[in-house]
């Protein structure tokens, strides 16, 4: 295997991770603070529709796909260094599961334990041909999407991420701008079609979907189809979002303007868990549980964006890794790593 070129590819992945995190919090906050059901014809009702059209089930697929890419890169790099990549990866996902279990105590809808479990299931696929992984991932994703089986969605997405790593897609993006643009346009067309289909079932009244569907909700079948189609079309919109961002990143000015997103993504584990911490802290300090509205949840998320984006950029000016990324790395390799960046000599 050729040596893996890291810099540009990993930078691209960090932008995508950061972007995915921006969307994930908008949905997670709803359950964490038990957001109030919007009033009919209110701004909150409009924002709820926006979330279920453009955010819900549209961002975690990106994160799942990137986990698969990272899975491949981690083992490939370890093997290139002469280490046992499979054993190191097992230790890595064990530590991730521990992080996830602790996080689960505060956020029952957390994803780290799911990724760790899926990583264990996906390990044998590392040695399978990339063509087989791509075909299997597409078939599984189609099957899961048709049935809107959200709980199983990460599996095919991680497998597709693994195959993308095997194809070394993120090393070739600069050479395939036209292909990326065609893919993104195709995903845009499919996204428009999916959204129009979902719009046909948009519920007239706001709803509460935080702890299961309301039993006395009018037009229950319509609501179920609306939510079903939202999950089913999620990977398509995710692919469009990711493709559009990748096209933007081809421009140097876009990379500079979006550089805070890169730092945000480099500290994805720290920021994902601290999102929960900041939401729960705000809920406790400002008595937001069961009282906050949909629109107010957006303002709180924007405040958390500012805090985390600034913190990530400042932290990485002086440190090599995010706080939890550093702990994760040391527990994976069972040795200490310096966290501070070396100061350049005058």
From Swiss-Prot:
Its main location: membrane. It is a multi-pass membrane protein. The chain crosses the membrane at residues 15-35, 55-75, 93-113, 139-159, 182-202, 229-249, 269-289, 295-315. InterPro entries: Bact_Transport_Assoc, DUF418. The keyword Iron does not apply. It is found in: Cell membrane. Keywords: Cell membrane, Membrane, Transmembrane, Transmembrane helix, Transport. GO terms for cellular component: plasma membrane. Involved in transport. To E.coli YeiB, B.subtilis YxaH and B.subtilis YrkO. PANTHER family: HYPOTHETICAL MEMBRANE SPANNING PROTEIN, INNER MEMBRANE PROTEIN. This is Uncharacterized 39.9 kDa protein in amylase 3'region.
